[in-house]
């Protein structure tokens, strides 16, 4: 009798309806929720998703505007910018279409693969896109990922970073962008399937398949391995845009081998590829080349948009140093300005810096380290001396002389000199 009385006393903890007044009453730890409250919560979540999506899609610039903003930060790579601008614009328009409920034509998600040498701007392009669109963005290094159950990061940790970037707003996170760098490092060790497990290569590719295609993933909010008893957050990856990038060192040889093989015969020009640089060779990239490199066909299939980035020449590196809104030299000039000092760099010095970066094959990424090394002693001194003008010449870059320091107080005019001297028009 006591049990029967208890059953009759059960009520929903949210709306206070009794058990016999609702269809279902679901029990939790010391609480109950009825089916009507569950439906109401579901409607609230759907409405929040619509609002979050509307905020994103209503502010999407056109492909031309996206490309224009990319030009302010990224030098060169015009074709890659155009492809990315169109792909991102179409991706978020697709979300708007899906949310509208008009499903006459099913629009599939188009993830992106960026292939280009180190320091060519792959990461910067992805970061700038996220900034333009004002959506949650996170980066992951594919080299740290391993198959579940092995030492290393699980692929779900990538989704956790996106959740953190969105301040655990699930609706926003589900419309975010994930950039996976060094994806060429998870290529399988040989073209033929291996009997032994390849936990950091093919195993990672297999683990990434589902989240890239679209699935409801269980994300551990405190990290997967240190807190196994935690509750999981359910995150739908169907509308998350994945951008993968990698240098793919050696793929040019695979392309050259294929193109030379296809041109065997009396009319074949055997020297044609010797005259091409890597950027021109990469433009002939086919899916079979990626397969030979070590990406499995299923993984390639999740990346329908493939674009290649050009190698940066000396002029491009000089432009990167001086022209963009966040140009490296402008950043150092601002740091000197905060110490009541000025920084002037001769054009010949810029040329030498660019040549050094080219020799190291580090692309734009190596420019900052070269400048940091050149300016270290000057930054150490001007913080104490104040009112100093530091001039960097070609001889300074080559290590023949120290940076030239002159007092601004002793000069007749305190009018600031240009950040860079003697730049040709």
Swiss-Prot record:
InterPro entries: AAA+_ATPase (IPR003593), ATP-dep_Clp_protease_ClpX (IPR050052), ATPase_AAA_core (IPR003959), Clp_ATPase_C (IPR019489), Clp_protease_ATP-bd_su_ClpX (IPR004487), ClpX_bact (IPR046425), P-loop_NTPase (IPR027417), Znf_CppX_C4 (IPR010603). Transmembrane segments: none annotated. Residues 1-53 form the ClpX-type ZB domain. Gene3D superfamilies: 1.10.8.60, ClpX chaperone, C4-type zinc finger domain, P-loop containing nucleotide triphosphate hydrolases. Zn(2+) binds at residues 12, 15, 34, 37. GO terms for biological process: cell division; proteolysis involved in protein catabolic process. The keyword Metal-binding applies. One of its GO terms (cellular component) is HslUV protease complex. Keywords: ATP-binding, Chaperone, Metal-binding, Nucleotide-binding, Zinc. The keyword Cell cycle does not apply. Signal peptide: none annotated. GO terms for molecular function: ATP binding; ATP hydrolysis activity; ATP-dependent protein folding chaperone; protein dimerization activity; unfolded protein binding; zinc ion binding. ATP binds at residues 117-124. It holds the Pfam family AAA_2. It comes from the Bacteria. ATP-dependent specificity component of the Clp protease. It directs the protease to specific substrates. Can perform chaperone functions in the absence of ClpP. Component of the ClpX-ClpP complex. Forms a hexameric ring that, in the presence of ATP, binds to fourteen ClpP subunits assembled into a disk-like structure with a central cavity, resembling the structure of eukaryotic proteasomes. This is ATP-dependent Clp protease ATP-binding subunit ClpX. The gene is clpX.
């Amino acid at each position: 009798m006591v049990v029967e009385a208890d059953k009759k006393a059960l009520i929903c903890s949210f709306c206070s309806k009794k058990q016999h007044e609702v269809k279902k009453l679901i029990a939790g730890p010391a609480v109950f929720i009825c089916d009507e409250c569950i439906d109401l919560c579901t409607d609230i979540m759907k409405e929040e998703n619509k609002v979050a999506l509307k905020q994103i899609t209503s502010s999407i610039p056109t492909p031309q505007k996206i490309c224009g903003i990319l030009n302010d930060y990224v030098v060169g790579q015009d074709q890659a910018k155009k492809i990315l601008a169109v792909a991102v614009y179409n991706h978020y328009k697709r979300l708007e279409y899906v949310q509208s409920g008009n499903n006459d034509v099913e629009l599939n998600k188009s993830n992106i693969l960026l292939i280009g040498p180190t320091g060519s701007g792959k990461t910067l392009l992805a970061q700038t896109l996220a900034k333009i669109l004002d959506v949650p963005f996170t980066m992951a290094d594919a080299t740290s990922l391993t198959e579940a159950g092995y030492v290393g990061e699980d692929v779900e940790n990538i989704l956790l970073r996106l959740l953190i970037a969105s301040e655990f707003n699930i609706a926003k996170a589900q419309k975010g962008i994930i950039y996976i760098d060094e994806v060429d490092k998870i290529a399988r060790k040989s073209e033929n399937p291996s009997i032994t497990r390849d936990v950091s290569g093919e195993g990672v590719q297999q683990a990434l398949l589902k989240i890239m295609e679209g699935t409801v993933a269980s994300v551990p909010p405190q990290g997967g391995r240190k807190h196994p008893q935690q509750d999981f957050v359910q995150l739908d990856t169907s509308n998350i845009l994945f951008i993968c990038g990698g240098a793919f060192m050696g793929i040019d040889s695979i392309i050259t081998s294929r193109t030379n093989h296809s041109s065997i015969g009396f009319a074949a020009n055997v020297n044609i590829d010797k005259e091409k640089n890597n950027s021109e060779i990469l433009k002939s990239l086919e899916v079979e080349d990626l397969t030979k490199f070590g990406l499995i066909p299923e993984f390639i299939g999740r990346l329908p948009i493939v674009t290649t980035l050009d190698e940066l020449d000396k002029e491009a590196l000089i432009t990167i140093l001086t022209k963009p809104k966040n140009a490296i030299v402008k950043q150092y000039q601002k740091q000197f300005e905060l110490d009541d000092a000025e920084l002037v760099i001769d054009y010949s010095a810029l040329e030498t810096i660019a040549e050094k970066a080219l020799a190291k094959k580090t692309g734009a990424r190596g420019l900052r380290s070269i400048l940091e090394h050149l300016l270290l002693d000057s930054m150490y001194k001007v913080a104490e001396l104040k009112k100093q003008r530091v001039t960097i010449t070609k001889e300074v870059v080559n290590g023949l002389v120290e940076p030239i320091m002159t007092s601004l107080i002793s000069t007749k005019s305190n009018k600031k000199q240009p950040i860079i001297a003697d730049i040709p028009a």
